[in-house]
Amino acid sequence: MTLVFALDLAACSVISVDLTPRVRPLEEETVEGRGDAKIVIVELAGVLSDAESAPILSVGNPPARVPLLVRLREELMKASDDSKVRAIVLRINSPGGTVTASDIIYRELMLFREKARVPIIAALMDVAASGGYYAALAADSIVAHPTTITGSIGTIMLTVNAQGPMDKLGLAAITVKSGEHKDMGSPFRALTPEERQMFQSVIDDLHGQFVKLVAERRRLPRPTAARLADGRIYTAEQALQLKLIDAIGYLPDVLAQARKAAGVEEARIVVYKRPREYRATYYAKAETGGSAVEAALAPLATLGMSGPRFLYLWWP
């Protein structure tokens, strides 16, 4: 938003004041530790989506936010260009998100590993389920907090059927289409059995990709991975017994493991932040995290009214 004031003085002057929030480049901040080597904490929080993360509830001019995928790539590029970065700690607190966003995050992390040749240790926090766990599969090692909820390996499609309420209101949607199934999944009519089967085939295919990745990255037999991927959630202890994770520990334990994997005895723990963004310790959240209310409403914002969405998401 730009305000323009015209002042009639000796010569006409125009003063332009730009009140639009500006996104500034990331800065590096050391939150603890010492030495030349660096361990960078990268955060994945909230619903994984390529949508802009503008506040759902805000008063006045909302602060500038950067979409999660944009921020992730920006952080990984900054880390890969720094020869002193010896390890990445990927802190995950997410129930998952869209299939595509989850897969892009996994791919970006794998590309970083290939380029930078530094270990990635995933630290699972409150929830690292479905797409959150999918992203963790890119790590060299997965460590869960003792109270982490993970798993929910599977695919879901959510849509809305408003036909009943519209019928009661005497409203009807008029659709002109080129083919019988062009509007399949529309909220204005129910699915036919044939269309439900079509959607199920898509779900099964996307689910198969998830299961294949679990089997490959966790070195599990495909039938075992498929058995674990029925959508249920697991505690940290259950996930460890099922070989879905490598260890249980706290964030300091993860940092110690990162130092060991990097082959250094001491290192600076580094986060990337925007100017004025508060990140004084390794527990501080990045700007994309949002408030608790925003986190609760984020799945609704992700789904929107744009039709069916295919999700790697745990949303009880």
Question: For the regions a protein language model found, what residue spans apply to each?
Answer:
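Flexible, glycine/proline-enriched loop segments at strand-loop-helix junctions
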Residues: G151-I153
